Regions:
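RNA substrate-binding interface of SAM-dependent RNA methyltransferases
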Residues: 41, 67-70, 79-81, 103-198
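Structured adenosyl-cofactor binding patch, chiefly the S-adenosyl-L-methionine
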Residues: 97, 135-139, 153-166, 224-272
């Protein structure tokens, strides 16, 4: 059992809370029963499992440890002070994992008929990003494109907010010019953008079956270079004194409109 806070392995794991170390290693730290369980279920590449026996008291937790050991995962037992130095949860559950990040290169992606993707341009809040990942999973959106200078989806706050969806939605990083070139060869993926100034109400829009919902940053919205790529621009009408919605909320509203529209189409087809 590791009891030293200065143990070299523990120090290296602790550094994964920092962006530069996650980028350098291609790894991230996931904490908690649910997230570790979903990592195992999804076939994520788990490099190390960190266990605190005094905190990991549930039968499900022990089942996760047994599964990891059968897969040959390196399992490290640590005491409570050491685990607390790694944890970000208010009430640590005694289990965490060091996991390899998963990315797909934009140029390798080919849209399949009926797929729903989401693109986020310069999103800065990791909690918003994690929440959007969770919503993508819920509505069946298969890919999330992070455009330009987005926050890290493997930030601990994003991983926590995703509730395990970090393992089920494919992630891609790119920038405006590369995205424009890619879309020139994949125009079957219809881009729907959002703007407060758009004429079309999101609830009155017929969304294409193969669709990418493109959302701008929390403060600036979509730049003109992205608006020019959009086939449709929609807005969410608002009353009251506020002039904008939280990005994760706005994304969720439109995604569920798309989802419900698709559900109604499938139900209607099934009744014919």
């Amino acid at each position: 059992m590791i009891t030293s806070l200065s143990n070299s392995t523990i120090v290296a794991i602790r550094k994964l809370h920092r962006l530069k170390d996650r980028r350098a290693t291609g790894l991230f730290l996931a904490e908690g029963l649910r997230v570790v369980g979903q990592a195992l279920d999804s076939g994520a590449e788990i490099r190390q499992l960190i266990i605190c026996p005094d905190l990991l008291i549930s039968e499900y937790g022990q089942q996760l440890v047994d599964r990891a050991r059968k897969l040959g995962v390196d399992c490290l037992e640590v005491n409570e002070p050491v685990f607390a130095s790694l944890a970000r949860k208010d009430t640590p559950q005694g289990i965490a994992a060091v996991i390899a990040q998963r990315w797909q290169v934009l140029e390798s992606l080919t849209p399949q008929e009926g797929e729903l993707w989401v693109g986020l341009q310069a999103v800065q809040n990791p909690g918003n990003l994690g929440t959007i990942l969770r919503t993508c999973d819920a509505v069946g959106a298969t890919r999330l494109l992070l455009l330009d200078d987005c926050t890290d989806p493997y930030d601990p706050a994003a991983v926590k907010a995703s509730m395990g969806s970090i393992f089920t939605v494919t992630l891609t990083k790119t920038h405006a010019e590369a995205f424009r070139v890619w879309h020139t060869g994949h125009e079957e993926m219809v881009i729907v953008g959002t703007s407060d100034h758009a004429d079309e109400d999101y609830a009155q829009t017929v969304y294409p079956q193969t669709c990418l919902l493109l959302m701008g940053s929390e403060r600036q919205g979509l730049p003109d270079e992205y608006i020019q790529l959009c086939t449709k621009m929609v807005r969410i009408p608002m009353e009251g004194s506020c002039d904008s919605l939280n990005l994760a909320v706005a994304t969720g509203i439109i995604l569920y409109q798309i989802y419900n529209q698709r559900r109604n189409i499938f139900q209607s087809a099934g009744q014919q």
